[in-house]
Amino acid sequence: MGLLTGKTAIVTGAARGIGKAIALKFAAEGANIAFTDLVIDENGQNTEKEIAAYGVKVKGYASNAASFEDTAKVVEQIHKDFGSVDILVNNAGITKDGLMMRMSEGQWDAVIAVNLKSAFNFIHACTPIMMRQKQGSIINMASVVGVHGNAGQCNYSASKAGMIGLAKSIAQELGSRGIRANAIAPGFIITEMTAKLSDEVKAEWNKRIPLRRGGTPEDVANIALFLASDMSSYVSGQVIQVDGGM
């Protein structure tokens, strides 16, 4: 019997990286997985196969998380397909870095839409289902950049700070309905995206980390499992940093 046996989890942006690691971790603990991405390409199809290997129900959905209407439709379909929505992980995210004075309105708007508005969209669509169930766990993927800020990432920092504020507010609004909301703030995590950085940049990052190394997607997935499961039944409105001590 796994920690999440019989539960249904929605994980956004789960075709690769941290989202994929979370979906696989949940599946290993018995959760049925509905994951979304802008398109379900070869990466998404491979993710679906890897999750299915755990013997759970899984389906990938192509959806624009930044669209309120698209999100409402996909959550309705997921509820029909799976019968419940017990866990929501808002992981969809992009970066469009640049110094503030050189940043275009389009760069700002795109990051806020995908990183922050998408979380509002999914929470708004999933909350009525969770309220009827009288239970649910919402996990927002934030970042240490949302806690400390970072030069050249004002749009990303603002979106991730917003994810923290959103989780804390939802925790207060929905706690009486048995719904918990928390945020995870990863630090430097080794993914396909960060693997493209130069050795010099990665070495500089490691110098700033007390543990002197980057984290893995599995490090983040372990915390997500804790927050999704009954192990954290009295934890809500919190931000857990997974950053090696930064």
PLM regions: where:
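Conserved glycine-rich Rossmann-like NAD(P)H-binding loop of the short-chain dehydrogenase/reductase
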Residues: 29-46
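C-terminal substrate-recognition "lid" of short-chain dehydrogenase/reductases
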Residues: 120-123, 179, 213-242
